[in-house]
Amino acid sequence: MAANAEPRRRPGVGVGVVVLSCEHPRCVLLGKRKGSFGAGSFQLPGGHLEFGETWEECAQRETWEEAGLHLKNVCFASVVNSFVEKENYHYVTILMKGEVDMTHDSEPRNMEPEKNESWEWVPWEEFPPLDQLFWALRCLKEQGYDPFKEDLNHLEGYRGEHLERTTKTP
């Protein structure tokens, strides 16, 4: 690499978790970000995929670390490619879906108050507007994903086009 060449940037890899509970029918667990990029936007539990970790392990770990909940029946839900050039943000996020394991605590606790205002159960059909959702969740909603359907039809034809560029890249 030439001395003045910019180092090549690579997207991050994250895992987001669509958390469901039999005690809150047709609701999904949502938090509100604070103190970091995307402050004020609504988010799912989730975070970085650790080296050597499976997607399911990451979903379990992040949900426990952030909301104090144990999950069962964790499965793949979707994948999104979120790129916002003006924010220097590019993540590929694997979305997993899981149910609260009712043999443990069934209500979320805010385990990271410096990063999240609170957790609440929100009906899927009554989600905040898209512009109030953090990138991965916004892309998931734009795909037409429905956590209460078992099919993956929302991925038909998806090529990772949830991108916001200020300039065209060749």
Swiss-Prot record:
Induction: Progressive reduction of protein levels after 4 month of age in the hippocampus of SAMP8 mouse, a mouse with early aging syndrome and reduced ability of learning and memory. Mg(2+) binds at residues 62, 66. CDD domains: NUDIX_MTH2_Nudt15. One of its GO terms (biological process) is response to reactive oxygen species. Its EC number is 3.6.1.9. One of its GO terms (molecular function) is 8-oxo-7,8-dihydroguanosine triphosphate pyrophosphatase activity. It catalyses: a ribonucleoside 5'-triphosphate + H2O = a ribonucleoside 5'-phosphate + diphosphate + H(+); a 2'-deoxyribonucleoside 5'-triphosphate + H2O = a 2'-deoxyribonucleoside 5'-phosphate + diphosphate + H(+); a 5'-end CoA-ribonucleoside in mRNA + H2O = a 5'-end phospho-adenosine-phospho-ribonucleoside in mRNA + (R)-4'-phosphopantetheine + 2 H(+). Magnesium may be the real cofactor in vivo. Gene3D superfamilies: Nucleoside Triphosphate Pyrophosphohydrolase (3.90.79.10). Residues 75-163 are annotated as: Interaction with PCNA. It is an enzyme of class 3 (hydrolase). A motif (Nudix box) lies at residues 47-68. Its cofactor is Mg(2+); Mn(2+). Keywords: Hydrolase, Magnesium, Manganese, Metal-binding. Residues 8-144 form the Nudix hydrolase domain. May catalyze the hydrolysis of nucleoside triphosphates including dGTP, dTTP, dCTP, their oxidized forms like 8-oxo-dGTP and the prodrug thiopurine derivatives 6-thio-dGTP and 6-thio-GTP. Could also catalyze the hydrolysis of some nucleoside diphosphate derivatives. Hydrolyzes oxidized nucleosides triphosphates like 8-oxo-dGTP in vitro, but the specificity and efficiency towards these substrates are low. Therefore, the potential in vivo sanitizing role of this enzyme, that would consist in removing oxidatively damaged forms of nucleosides to prevent their incorporation into DNA, is unclear. Homodimer. Interacts with PCNA; interaction is disrupted in response to UV irradiation. Has the ability to complement a mutation of mutT in E.coli and thereby completely suppress the increased frequency of spontaneous mutations. Belongs to the Nudix hydrolase family. This is Nucleotide triphosphate diphosphatase NUDT15.
